[in-house]
């Protein structure tokens, strides 16, 4: 039964035309994956590593892990001289006997709206290598037309993304974006692959619960993510408590899917976060499998260059 479910799962995401975007619990620390307009908005050079194990302990009959596994490396930074931000993401997403290796490059033009607000206009380019190892399947019926591939087969897909990112100084952010805009198509074995277009709305706020001395500051940081492929809609709502920008923790809810816990520690320019999804009981009788996710990173703040004040002699005006 597990092998059958794994096969159905793989081809639901690949052979049946739908390539879904990757799901992350720590979306509030991984904004660039969802919205290219957010790159450089932290005014820091940030390098982040993330690993997610979906459905912990889910294996096939041979004991092989067929649950989704995701590894991600991201870098982004502001480029003040051209009022912009740039970013790059490399990731691998494994699902059963399917592997996706992708690169996303992002650029954002940052416009100042008054002294406290900036608006980012972003665009991104993505390259995806999708492969399926047909040799690992054990079909119940020889000659199954869905499993006629030989060995590992792959295809390359290119696509684009775009977004808007409004941000005030530390307090508030709001982003709208679309990924996989052109819905690129490819063929692996007998199956046509289509990258589904996704729409995202992300927002968050930093509210000071206690102000005062540096060592006593406490902030409430709620955030909200809505995603849709035009047919289905999913949302996450999360609340974090941040103690002096050093320790933080909280919880969240993913609609009809999971509740999750998040904890993090920041030491100087380094940070590490851990989240754990507690999957809600399924109505279809499938056993519950939880999902851990860990992120580590380094952020070095960059200050915009200070303009030198010029003085003019009125004689030459």
Model-predicted segments: where are they?
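Sec-dependent N-terminal signal peptides
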Residues: 7-8
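N-terminal signal peptide c-region/cleavage motif recognized by signal peptidases
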Residues: 13-15
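Subset of outer-membrane beta-barrel
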Residues: 19-317
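Intrinsically disordered, low-complexity regions enriched for glutamine and histidine
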Residues: 3, 17-18
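Positively charged n-region of N-terminal signal peptides that target proteins for export
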Residues: 1-4, 113-115
